[in-house]
Amino acid sequence: MQIPFKKDPIEFKQRALFATNVFDLLPSDHQCYVYEDIFEQLDTSSVEEQFSVHGQNAFHPRLITGILIYAYSQGVFSSREIEKRCHEDLGFMFISHFNCPNFRVLSDFRKDNHEFFKECFKQSALLAMEAGMASLGHVSLDGSKFKANTSKHKAMSYGRLKAKEKDLTDEIEDLIAKAAKCDEEEDEEHQDKSGYEIPEELKIKEKRLAKIKEAKEALEKREQDLNPGKKIDDKKQISFADKEARIMGKKGNFDYSYNGQISVDEDNQIIVGQHLSQNANDKREVEPALEEIKETTGDLPDEMSLDNGYMSGNNLESFDGKEIDVYVATGKGEKKDQRPIEDSNRKIKKVDFNYDESKDCFVCPAGHTLKLRTETNEGKKVYQGDKSACDLCHYKARCCSSKKGEPRTIHTDDKEPLRQKMREKMEQESSKEIYKKRKKIVEPVFGQIKNTGFRGFSLRGCKKASGEFSLACAVHNFRKIVKGILGGKVCLESGELAPTVV
């Protein structure tokens, strides 16, 4: 007996008398409908100004922006793959209005409008705030490394650049000398030719030398900006493909990357501030982060939490006068050992010393004073104890580690009072409870961004990569808004997002 499987609908092999709407095949609650409603509200006037009335009509910037945002939300980043989806995927067809922009159009728009994508991110954050999805009550800041569009194998150290530049210069001079000699000796025999054909070889070497010089000059400028007047270490490297990317470590691996910084609101994990940094660590990222939050939302948060990577004098100083209740975790070396000094043989660390701001000195566990010995124009300070007091102290073996027998020395800077206050604040149980929020606020967001497939940049150069990072952050916010609408947390009223009334 033949099993009666389901048959294909008759419309599959026969044309219907009346055309049907192909989008009826999509579920009524498909996310592309919500994205389309949101995209209609995007302000693209700043990009529209760059188009001309002459020539062939261009795709509207709002359409291209919508396609890119929707594509990133679906984990599609290749411009060729996006074009393909516009031909094959119903959701993409709806977002693109049955248009299929060439991959070059998509790629060039993404490459040439990095400033607009920052504005696009701002609109996503404000839209979320208007929908009641972010309140700036508690914001957490964190950073993560994103791979640059280059390779460690397309790089060279400063020492090798200098050596290679000299070698190529010598080789080119040698080739030119040989060519001139051949011209003189064989001009009559070969007439228009030298008889010793080398132009192509010379051309290749000259191109290589130009690239070497360009990379060397870029590295010298970078190091001069970072360390004015200091000699450049021969081990410093630069990438030929993306000269603005930096070698950064992540879980024991090193690669050319950028440091993506995001400030995330507690309410619904909306990103309210973002920027891309070339710094490998987070020691100086608070000031630009606060500026971005202010520029994006027009205000600053009531509370902020940051991990111990931000525990630096410069970062803490950035909060001065901002009226933000800040919680910064102390580093492993800055946490007090709970074991009593008297009842254990543990080493005495810097954190065991109390700083007296009024007298500008440190007091050791034995009650001796470490006075200020030297101070530089950059704010670096060195405090040192009295040698006779240290020699007679019963803690000396656990405290003084100098092989020369010098008294206990503490190296710090003029920001020490700020660090001490933060350490004391973070020892309180109430502070620890507030800080616990951080793990649930910002860390999952990086996971969500990377789970879509965005782990590195398609564009090169800090400005263009910053634009792509802004786009990725805007996509995250739009995904949250769409999820909120589909989940009933927010609704559309009169074409605008508004909180759902419960």
Model-derived regions, located:
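A ubiquitous short alpha-helical element
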Residues: I3-F5, F51-G55, S430-E433
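Anion-binding and metal-coordination hotspots
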Residues: L68, G75-E88, N99-V502
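Basic, short loop/linker segments at the boundary and entry of helix-turn-helix/winged-helix-like folds
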Residues: P27-I69
